[in-house]
């Protein structure tokens, strides 16, 4: 099965990537710049209480991406509503900061840890400490690699995210039936994020046959994950790379038909590059997360689609799992085969991602209360 093979391959790739490249509830406010790197933090007492003094530590990677702000806020709201004290921390995309935050959560008596890792293979020291303290760990959206400390994994179906993107391109260009030829460039995610490989592989499993038969040409020649990955999902990095591709391969007037972008922050960088350096027919641009700026771009015709991952759903599932762990109950999972972290296959709960475009964004995002209309003006 392709996903099983991918999980084995990613274990090796992520290991290699290491060489490159709670009393009151507190929330660490990330004051870093737009792509991370500034590890300055400021702790703010949010003053939550909990039945029985049960504490849950929530470690988020950064506030630089909109989605992590939403994940953290949803998690805190759901956990506090369930009666727990929440120690919510953001680490400004700095691994050592995140390790210190997790260690502080352990030392301050947190009963369960929910961790969205900055780098999948870099938390071994903190995970060992959690394991020795007997504290269960739920890996949140990003699988923590090469440790036996991870009890459960909660995420979206990451392979499906990629297939949704690939199938959208396949359908929009009628690739199964057309005799036309198309050009494509690929912008993938952070090589330190286990999910990025699943997104990439899901899309490429749909599109690779069309590359192989000549229907799609990648003029830059950059198709391997290692060539198209974007460190820390940074918009500026994606923009700079796409500007170089446009000037090197499309300045002669060749149309670029497809920009396969794994998520919205990389898509935004690609869209910025297109606006500044490209005069041809506007390409299909994919994305993921339905960030506000990207949803605005969908409305304006600058992004073709995104994949909506309702973080409220994921937060609710994690809160349910926390309660089941603390009550000694069987924990709900729906995947016990796909996600191998290098030590073991981690019992996982996968939420469903949803296709979004200009035709259904109002129903998905506004009618559901995820955004207000004013936010998308």
Label the predicted regions:
Residues 2-5, 22-377:
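A residue-level marker of the well-folded mature domains of exported/periplasmic proteins
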Residues 17-21:
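C-terminal motif of bacterial Sec signal peptides marking the signal peptidase cleavage site
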């Amino acid at each position: 099965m392709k996903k099983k093979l991918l999980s084995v391959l990613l274990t090796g790739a992520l290991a290699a990537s290491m060489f490159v490249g709670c009393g009151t509830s507190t929330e660490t406010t990330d004051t870093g710049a737009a792509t991370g790197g500034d590890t300055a933090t400021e702790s703010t007492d949010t003053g939550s209480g909990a039945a029985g003094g049960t504490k849950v530590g929530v470690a988020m990677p950064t506030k630089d991406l909109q989605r992590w702000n939403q994940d953290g806020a949803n998690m805190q709201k759901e956990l506090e509503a369930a009666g727990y004290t929440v120690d919510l921390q953001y680490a400004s995309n700095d691994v050592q900061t995140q390790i210190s935050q997790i260690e502080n959560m352990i030392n301050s008596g947190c009963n369960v840890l929910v961790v969205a890792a900055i780098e999948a293979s870099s938390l071994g020291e903190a995970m060992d400490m959690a394991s020795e303290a007997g504290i269960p760990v739920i890996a949140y959206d990003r699988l923590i690699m090469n440790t036996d400390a991870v009890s459960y994994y909660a995420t979206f179906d990451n392979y499906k995210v990629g297939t949704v993107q690939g199938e959208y391109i396949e359908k929009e260009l009628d690739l199964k039936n057309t005799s036309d030829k198309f050009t494509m460039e690929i912008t993938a995610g952070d090589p330190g994020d286990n999910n990025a490989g699943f997104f990439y592989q899901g899309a490429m499993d749909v599109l690779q046959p069309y590359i192989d038969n000549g229907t799609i040409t990648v003029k830059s020649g950059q198709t391997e994950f290692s060539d198209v990955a974007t460190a820390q999902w940074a918009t500026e990095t994606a923009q700079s790379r796409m500007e170089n591709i446009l000037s090197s391969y499309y300045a002669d007037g060749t149309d670029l038909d497809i920009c396969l972008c794994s998520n919205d922050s990389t898509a935004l960088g690609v869209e910025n590059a297109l606006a500044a350096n490209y005069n041809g027919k506007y390409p299909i641009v994919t994305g993921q997360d339905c960030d506000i700026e990207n949803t605005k771009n969908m409305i304006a015709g600058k992004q073709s689609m995104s994949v909506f991952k309702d973080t409220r759903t994921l937060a609710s599932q994690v809160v349910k799992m926390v309660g089941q762990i603390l009550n000694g109950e069987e924990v709900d999972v729906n995947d016990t085969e796909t996600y191998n972290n290098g030590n073991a296959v981690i019992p996982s709960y996968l939420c469903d991602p949803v296709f979004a475009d200009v035709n259904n964004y109002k129903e998905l995002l506004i009618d559901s209360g995820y955004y207000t209309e004013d936010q998308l003006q």
